[in-house]
Every structure is written in C-alpha cells, then in structure tokens.
Amino acid sequence: MAYRNRNLASQTQRPLAPTAPRRRPVVTPQISDRSRLRGFANVGSGPCHPLTDRAANQHLQTYEANVKGSFELIVPFLKRISALQHDQDFVSKCQSLARSELGFDLPSHLLEQAWVRALDMRALFAWCVFQSHQHVSDHFFQEDPLQGGEGSIQAKHFQSFLVDCGFHLLDVSPCADGRLAHTIAYALRIPFSSVRRRSHAGALFDVEKTVNRWIKTEHRRYREGVPNSADSPTRYLKVVTYHFSSLDPSHQGCAAHGSDDALAASAGQQRLLDFRESVENSFCCGASVDLLLIGLDTDTDAIRVHVPAADGSIVLDEWLSAEDLYHETLSLTSDEAMQHIAERVEAIAPKKPDEGMVAFIVKLIANNFSQIDYVKQSHAGPYPDAGHAERFIGVGIGFKEVHLRNLTYFAHLDTVEVGAPDLDVGVKIFKGLNVSRDLPIPVVVRFDYSGQVPGARDRAVTDCYRVNQAIAERYSELFDQGLLHTFLTIRDRDKKDTSEVVGSSLEPVHQEAH
C-alpha cells in the first residue's frame, strides 16, 4: 500500500510536514438542520426541574448536534464518491463534493489511484475522521463554543465559588470510557478551564504523577500566589468519577472493572486514599488533600455522590442519588430545592461534613439536574447508545477540546509501554465498533507542550513519532492491513491556538531512486 508510512518515528529530524492537504478549509460544510439534529429532540420544550438551565441546555445541544453531525456525514459521503470513482473527472468532482459537504480536501494521492485500483475507503474514512476532529479543535480554541475558557465569565465565577468552598484547585479523573468524556462540561456543568482533567481506564489515575501536579500547584501558590496565596486556608480537591449502567449493569458498566459497580467504586476510593497518604507521608506541617468519589450513570447522566465526612471518611455502599433528589424536589421552588439538597447531603455523611464540601456537592447535584433534563428531553428517555459509539481514540497528553459523550476514547500516556492497559481497552472497543465493519481505527496522537520552555516543541514532536512507532509495532497486524491509522498533533498549552499537525500514517511513501 503506497500510502502506508510505518516508520514515522525514524524521521524526527525533518520538519515532519505531511504532504497530504493540511490547510484549514475556507468552506464550511453544509450540514442541514435535519442532519445536525438527527436523534435529538428539542430540549427547549417540555417540563423541566425548577433548577434546570433551559438556555444552557439549548446551547449545549446545538454544539453537540453540530459536532456529531459532522462525523455522521462521513460514511454517506464516502458511499457517494465510491460510486463515482470511474468517472472521467473523478478527482475534481470528488474534491468539489468534499469541500462543499465536509469542508475540507481529501488526499490527492489516494484519489489519483482510482483509475488503476479500487479507492482505499479505509484510508479515506480515517482521513475524514481526522479532518473532522481538526474542525472541532479549531472551532473550540478559536471560538470557545462552550463558553468555559480561561478568562470567561463562567470560569471566573466558578473559581470564586471554589475558593469560597475552601478549595484552590479541582482535579478530576474520570474513566477513559468515551461515555464520560462530557463529564465536566455537561454532566457536572463546570467550566472546562476551571478543572484539571486526566482520564484513565477505570478512573485509576497515576498516583505519582498526581502528587507531582500537587507539588507544582502548591509551589506556584507559594511563588506566584496563583490561584491563591500559600497561606490561604484552602485545599487541593481530587475527584474520581467512576461509572455504571442503571439499565444493563452486568454488561454496560466499566470494562476495566468487569462491569462491577462496587469494584469500580472501591478501586476509585483506594486510589484516592493512596494519593492522600502519599502527600501526607512526603510532606510535613499537615500537608493533605480533600477527596471526593462520584459515580455517573452512563444511561441517564445522573450522578451519585459518596459524601465524605470532614475527616475524609466515606461509606462505599452509601451515596446520594441525583436522580432521586431530582424527583424529590420536582414540585418545589428553586430555593426550596436547594435547601432540600443541602439537608440530604449533610444527613447522609458518615460524620459531620465540611461546610465547604457540602456547598460544593450541592452545586454539583443542582447542576446535574440540568443534565438529567437534557438527556430526557434530547432522547425522550435514556441515551439510545447505551454502549460505546466513540469516533476515534485520543492518545497522549492533551485533548482539552474534547467534551462530548461518546466522541473519544482517551488513553492518556507518555509511553505505550506504560499506558498499554488503557490503549488495549480502546483498541478492543474499536474492534467492535469499526473493524467488525471493515473500517479502520482512527488514532489521534497529541502531545501538549509549554512554548515557554526551550526545546519543548521539538520534544513533543519526537514524543508523537515515538508513540506512533510503538502503536504500529504493538498493533502491527491492524496497522499493516490499513485497519489502524494515526494522526499526529502537538499544541502549545500556553496559548489559545489550536493544535498543529506534524504527521500521519496517511502520508504517501516516496520510492527511493536506484
């Protein structure tokens, strides 16, 4: 296959610019309202809970429908051009259709082979997924469609609220399952820039790396007074979000824990306790952190909160269900509902809870009511896609722009060797989603870097190619059959710019002269 480029890792000394089209499109894909909103009912109509934010629901639905609608256009488009590949003016006709319907060009070297061999639809499918993701990424960083970027009104208000609750930083680790990718912006309704998010299979975050991030946070408080001064009586709040299925608990729960809800919760709690113990053992003067364990029902997006006592203790088999509270407060006024939630939070804690933690949990539950209504009104009940329906795997460090359910399976890692368990789960999921339909697994590799550090960009590029080579070797059978494609990107986290493409397995392989 002429387009296969397995040895990208050996080319890190060159500029690494793919020869396939990379310019940002100037044509916006024409997605009809029907295509955009397929599967979505209007969330602006129908009865809601008094605490539900109707305007926010409408805004979030429009964003989700537009993004997912762009991915849904891919297969119908490819079916159309498949029927045209023997036309005399196929290449020009195909590119014109691609620009008008998808908003980007297709790789010319793949189209130009159509007269001598069948179109490589696997490669074209992967390319369309990658470019659609780039559209989403560009729009996210340039326009802040979720209105939660750094400096936004929502982010400022939430940070002020967080400090009032007694916390200076919120660090959340959801499961890497794509059904939790929307945890922050949708399920919890928190501005994305106000949260440090790292997803891991089973929500089993790396304790050592989290301790290092805690150290950097406390050091910055001491040196710069950001987000507040080191002498302020606030704490670092670490949250684990595991997941479960209320409709099919034995099959649609967390794959990393064998769909065992109790195991998912206990493993998350243990990882939290290990983190706190590591901080307390390593630093003196009462250094510690606050912990919170949350479960998310992937069928309804309702959360359940294991309310901790002031000393951090929780009872694993006791939690507060947002779904239950939603129904308990449905006939109350908004003020009465908030009061009822607060009373229930305090009552279920094993011992007297911290006042700031109570206020924080009350807000999360109240926010979650909007998401409960969002799911009910968008889909007339639970999500129709109870299982996995992700569009691509995201590998590496980054993906700040992904905040939609079932869009991306995350595998946050520095090396494939260390992150193999997360990545293996993702590949297994996509064997069922894509390979079973003879479609490839699209893998976007991303490494964010700090542009303020000399040489950081070059190291990020090297990391991309190193991980790409490791993926090609670990999944060589899929890779060699064109059933796994990679797209390499980097991004300067110190800027609001979008990601930069530095390579792809879809680049043409140039034959050496003899």
Curated annotation (Swiss-Prot):
Which catalytic reaction applies to this protein? Answer: hydrogencarbonate + H(+) = CO2 + H2O
Pfam families from the UniProt entry: CsoSCA_C (PF08936), CsoSCA_cat (PF20686), CsoSCA_N (PF20687)
Where is the segment annotated Disordered? 1-27
Leader sequence residues: none
Keywords for this protein? Bacterial microcompartment, Carbon dioxide fixation, Carboxysome, Lyase, Metal-binding, Photosynthesis, Zinc
Q: Describe how the cofactor binds.
A: Binds 1 Zn(2+) per monomer.
Write down the superkingdom of origin: Bacteria
Q: Which EC number applies?
A: 4.2.1.1
GO terms, molecular function: carbonate dehydratase activity; metal ion binding
One GO cellular component assignment for this chain's record is: carboxysome
Q: List residues binding Zn(2+).
A: 175, 243, 254
Q: Which GO terms describe its biological process?
A: carbon fixation; photosynthesis
Enumerate the subcellular locations listed in this protein's record, separating them with semicolons.
Carboxysome
- What cofactor does its activity depend on? Zn(2+)
Please state the protein's primary subcellular location. other
What residues sit in the active site? 177
Q: In UniProt terms, what function does this protein have?
A: Reversible hydration of carbon dioxide. Essential for photosynthetic carbon dioxide fixation, supplies CO(2) to RuBisCO (ribulose bisphosphate carboxylase, cbbL-cbbS) in the carboxysome.
Q: Which family does it belong to?
A: Belongs to the beta-class carbonic anhydrase family. CsoSCA subfamily.
- State the oligomer form and interacting partners: Homodimer.
Q: Could you tell me what this protein is called?
A: Carboxysome shell carbonic anhydrase
